[in-house]
């Protein structure tokens, strides 16, 4: 299941490449220095979406669970503090990805925001 979510996030971020708002938000996500993270943005978003599968609200316990159960799928998992910082910085992208999933799978429910409108609103 994690692989499916990760593949969807990769497809989502590929579709945003070249967009000026996306480039601006990526520069804010990376900070003034080059990115020091061990996980890519796609992995961070995928792991945070996958958290809903386990129904854990506590990020610390989820981090321990990933470290023990998914060490083969996520071998370069950072320590808890860096994982928490990356999760907090990626909230905008998680919301945009969730909107992307709703748009892909909508039948009756129609959202009024495009992905870029959500990125602008949250930022």
Where are these regions (language model features)?
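Short alpha-helical elements
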Residues: 1-123
